[in-house]
Regions:
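Non-catalytic terminal extensions that flank enzyme cores
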Residues: 1-47
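His/Glu-based metal-binding/catalytic segments typifying zinc-dependent metallopeptidases
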Residues: 40-42, 49, 162, 166, ...
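M16 family metallopeptidases and their MPP-like homologs
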Residues: 45-55, 81-129, 136-147, 174-199, ...
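Active-site His/Glu-centered metal-binding helix of metallohydrolases
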Residues: 62, 66-70, 578
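Generic recognition of flexible, low-complexity loop/linker segments
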Residues: 94, 210-214, 273-276, 319, ...
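Hydrophobic, small-residue-rich alpha-helical packing segments that form membrane-like cores
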Residues: 150-219, 225-243, 247-274, 280-282
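Non-catalytic, conformational "gating/processing" segments within enzyme and secreted inhibitor domains
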Residues: 158, 210-242, 720-755, 942
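Extended, regular secondary-structure scaffolds
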Residues: 211, 223, 232-251, 374, ...
Length: 973
């Protein structure tokens, strides 16, 4: 069958998308009005999504709650959580759903055609025929509900989205971005919080929620996307027959309206909560925000991305530097948001004070006027363009399929113009245009028009308030107490019964016959062989080099790995400071701003990272490297190598002013990452109680070090510069160096030539070195911050108790994450997420994410061994868990990821036979293998290593669980 044979569809456009080496097709389903965009090519990582325009009219989070709930069972697949069943039992390379300010999308991806069809089928049924109309419990569980355990207990509110958004509203960055949207678009859907404001989520009724689904989840309001190597005609014929052909187009107005421009800029002040020990001084956020036309201007869409780099984001960018030099804020960021109908551009100063507002605005205006008059730095513009174009051509989105990112980008134009889904994907002509404009005043005129003369602008101030969370919680408790007091005895009994009923509903598993309706692959569909390693050893001037011979599309990925095991334990946090300094201070030939421009003009970037490689046999053995990475086109590698030498051997570490700026900015960034990634912070900290390797990844010690350095900089600066210089000369030596290269064979000679010039410049190793003495100490800490939720972590090491690693642990991870922990911590407990991990060196952790509970979650962890002991699974269930595990193991890799995986195996001394053995253990696993892990996990939990990050009041109330409870910012005081 061919596309032209499909009578149900009208082909609106079919043409090559040369920039992506693909064919683009735009179609409309005649009967239902559904829109379809196809990007057809030879990529076997196929992507599908169905999306809807979902403009909210309030901040109850209705669009977000629907996104969660349509994946809780449907007509054809009536299980309670088909999403989880698919995660456990499919070979998906991506599976999720996302709510944006005015759209909701349901994407899936898979390299297996049968699996891809299964996933499409479940998702199409979920959005069009969800069980939400049959079971109000789904709305209560995922959205919100009142809870009352007994007549004497207080009424509380729980729900997954409710708790997720309590976590989101704990972050000042999130609060600021929401206030910017509200300030600039007060009369449009963007003024509302599509994710839901916890204050307003409980205002949403079940009927209003169903009405929203009825209104917007119709094919005529849908956007269907297909990408990759597939029989497009077959997929479209199936969609027509199974779903779209059953609907008639209706008159539905979901158009996103433009905000009428302002007559003058407006100002908004809003509060956010800080903990009782944080200072209100230097904790305000100031932002200046403007609206930039519409997302349908492809030149402006990219030009402001470049201006973001040239003005604010690049090291030493003029607007950033002017504000820092004026003493306004410790971190200056730019925010160009092109994912809405009217893109916005923001300049944000973090960690400043409200009285600096006029000064902040004056510095912005003076700096921008100076740039318009005297011209922008041409190299800075070129660097921004080249960096953006390199990323576009490389299309490396980490573990996200590139087809998914292309599909999401389609909606930046498609949502507002049915005929232009590919507008922003065809970017090479725009890059050429922008390069030509560098020598003109094009960019300066954009500054004049959109940043200086633009009345459609706002100033948003986010001020800290101590104990605001506690005040809001007290107000909520009072409101709930009044609500309870207004209930009759019968109503109280009903609420207790409803609470009990919901728990019973959550505890009742889906019937086996329903579970069997979820389509699933067989064990025979799985690839038996593990992915190969690509390691060839050679030597250049006595330095070991490992070459990963992989097709890399003309790019060389080069990593210099310097051993740092000799760095004393007390100096480990300073490795993070060194990493932040290199490339961000002046060098012999460049200011740090010029250095950044040179890097971005000639390469895909130069970065540093700390790589930790635990032994797979010995829990106390590990390798740790200071890694300096670059990527460049073959003909640009000489420039990349020259810039690496410049950075490593001529950086000016004596510049105290610059050093202070870097430390203050780094501390500010770390604050944000602690609030957004508290699960990672807590689990790593818990592992430092017993694991030497974990000490190198401990965010909290690093954060405390930065707080101390910032607060006492004048006393510490001499010792700090001396320490950093000593580190440079002791780390960057020939004896410490190991080189990793990912490219085809024909690129290797280019690398060897550059290494021959690089190696003689390395420092000499002075004297004998011994490995750092790291002595883990069990502390069991609670770290209080201004969050409304918690991140609860338990950890231990099974090798310490004589147990060996087994492939079945990979399956246990899936079982825990999507059965035991999911049901108890997320479904019943209301947390947004839960994770667990089992390393080959024995390090093990369990952690919750945006969790309202502490003691209850800890008790759930204690129940894991009993769950494993009683674990039963028939052949179908075991196969499902195994498929989900293999899906995790077989995530498609780009060239750099293949190289990194091969290098990690080399450093950890993992043979191909060992990973094949692990894969065989996974594919051949039985329920007995899972039950056999009971004693291992019991031994880990018996260590009782507990670390919790989060809500101040909850941690204080549970102080007895910890050795110490303290504020995250304690070292600042």
């Amino acid at each position: 069958m061919q596309l032209k044979d499909l009578q149900a569809y009208e082909i609106l456009e079919k043409r090559p998308i040369k920039d992506l080496n693909s064919e683009g097709i735009i179609l409309r389903h005649k009967k239902s009005g559904a829109r379809i965009a196809v990007i057809s090519n030879d990529d076997d990582n196929k992507v599908f999504y169905i999306g809807f325009r979902t403009p909210p009219e309030d901040s109850t989070g209705v669009a977000h709650i629907i996104e969660h709930t349509v994946l809780c069972g449907s007509d054809k697949y009536p299980v309670k959580d088909p999403f989880v069943e698919l995660v456990k039992g499919s070979l998906n390379t991506f599976l999720n759903a996302m709510t944006y300010p005015e759209k909701t999308i349901y994407p899936i991806a898979s390299c297996n055609d049968k699996d891809f069809q299964n996933l499409m089928s479940v998702y199409m049924d979920a959005v069009f025929h969800p069980n939400i109309y049959k079971y109000q419990e789904i709305f209560q569980q995922e959205g919100w509900h009142y809870e009352l355990e007994s007549e004497d207990a207080p009424v509380t509110i729980n729900g997954v989205v409710y708790n997720e958004m309590k976590g989101a509203f704990s972050s000042p960055d999130d609060v600021l971005s929401r206030q910017i949207m509200t300030s600039l678009f007060p009369d449009t859907t963007y003024a509302n919080v599509s994710g839901g404001d916890p204050l307003h989520i409980p205002e949403l009724t079940y009927e209003e929620y169903l009405d929203f689904h009825r209104r917007y989840y119709h094919p005529c309001n849908s956007y269907i996307y297909l990408y990759g190597d597939m029989d497009v005609a077959e997929k479209l014929a199936w969609m027509d027959e199974a779903y779209l052909g059953k609907y008639e187009a209706i008159g539905l107005d979901s158009e996103i309206k433009l905000q009428k421009p302002f007559e003058k800029p407006i100002e908004v002040t809003h509060k956010y909560s800080i903990s009782s020990t944080e200072s209100e001084e230097n904790n305000t956020y100031l932002s200046y925000n403007t609206v930039i036309e519409t997302a349908l201007d492809e030149k402006l869409y990219l030009a402001f991305d470049i201006l973001d780099y040239a003005l604010v984001s690049a090291p030493g960018a003029p607007l950033k530097q002017a504000l820092i030099d004026a003493g306004i804020g410790s971190e200056i960021t730019g925010g160009y948001d092109s994912g809405t109908l009217q893109p916005t551009f923001s300049v944000i100063a973090k960690n400043t004070n409200p009285q600096e507002k006029e000064h902040f605005l004056a510095v912005i205006r003076e700096t921008l006027e100076g740039l318009v008059k005297n011209g922008l730095n041409k190299k800075s513009l070129l660097a921004g363009i080249n960096s953006s174009e390199f990323r576009y051509r490389e299309a490396d989105f980490g573990h996200f399929p590139k087809g998914l990112l292309y599909g999401i980008q389609c909606l930046d134009s498609w949502l507002y113009d049915d005929m232009r889904p590919f507008l922003h994907l065809e970017a090479l002509d725009t890059y050429r245009f922008l390069k030509e404009q560098v020598e003109t005043d094009y960019f300066e005129q954009l500054i004049q028009k959109y940043l200086l003369n633009n009345k459609h602008a706002s100033v948003v101030i986010i001020e800290p308030e101590k104990g605001l969370n506690a005040k809001n919680e007290a107000a909520l408790e009072k409101k709930l107490a009044e609500y309870k007091a207004g209930l009759s005895e019968d109503e109280i009994r009903k609420l207790i019964a409803d609470t009990k009923h919901l728990k019973e509903y959550q505890e009742t598993p889906s019937p086996k016959e329903d579970l069997e309706k979820i389509p699933m692959l067989a064990r025979s569909d799985m690839k038996k062989e593990a992915a190969p390693f690509y390691n060839t050893e050679l030597s250049v001037k006595g330095v070991p080099v490992v070459h990963h011979d992989i097709y890399s599309n003309g790019i060389i990925y080069l990593t210099m790995l310097f051993d740092i095991a000799h760095v004393p334990a007390e100096d480990i946090p300073y490795l993070g400071v060194l990493k932040a300094v290199l490339g961000y201070v002046d060098t012999k030939n460049y200011s740090y701003a010029d250095f950044a421009n040179e890097v971005n003009i000639h390469t895909g970037g130069i970065s540093s990272t700390i790589g930790v490689y635990p032994s797979v046999k010995d829990k106390d053995d590990y390798q740790v490297k200071f890694e300096v990475r670059t990527k460049a086109l073959y003909d640009k590698l000489p420039e990349a190598a020259t810039l690496m030498k410049e950075m490593l051997f001529t950086s000016n570490i004596d510049d105290e002013k610059r050093l202070y700026e870097i430390i203050a900015e780094l501390k500010s960034r770390l604050q944000v990452s602690i609030s957004s990634a508290g699960h990672s912070v807590a689990s790593t900290r818990a592992m430092t109680y017993f694991s030497k390797a974990a000490a190198y990844k401990d965010t909290i010690t690093f954060y405390e070090t930065l707080c101390d350095l910032e607060a006492h900089f004048d006393e510490r600066k001499e010792a700090l510069t001396a320490k950093l210089k000593e580190m440079v000369s002791s780390i960057f030596t020939k004896e410490h160096l190991l080189v990793s290269v990912t490219c085809e064979k024909d690129g290797l000679s280019i690398v060897e030539t550059e290494l021959e010039k690089f190696i003689p410049m390395l420092y000499e190793t002075s004297g004998e070195e011994k490995q750092a003495e790291i002595v883990p100490v069990r502390k069991n800490e609670g770290f209080m911050d201004a969050s409304q939720v918690l991140y609860v972590a338990r950890a231990g090491n099974f090798r310490a108790h004589g147990f060996d690693y087994h492939g079945a642990l990979r399956i246990l991870k899936v079982i825990m994450e999507y059965d035991y922990l999911w049901i108890n911590i997320r479904v019943k407990g209301g947390a947004y997420g839960c994770m667990n991990g089992y390393m080959k060196n024995g390090d093990t952790y369990f952690v919750s994410y945006r969790d309202p509970n502490l003691e209850k979650t800890n008790e759930i962890y204690d129940g894991i061994p009993a769950y494993i002991e009683q674990f039963t699974a028939d052949e179908r269930d075991m196969t499902k868990y195994i498929i989900g595990t293999i899906s995790d193991m077989d995530v498609p890799m780009n060239p750099s990821t293949k190289g990194d995986r091969s290098m990690a195996a080399y450093l950890q001394n993992i043979s191909y036979e060992e990973i094949q053995k692990e894969r065989d253990q996974v594919i051949g696993a039985t329920q007995e293998d899972i039950r056999g892990l009971r004693d291992m996990i019991a031994s880990v939990l018996a260590e009782n290593n507990l670390c919790v990050v989060g809500n101040e009041e909850t941690l204080q109330a549970s102080e007895g669980m910890f050795g110490e409870v303290k504020h995250l910012n304690e070292s600042e005081r």
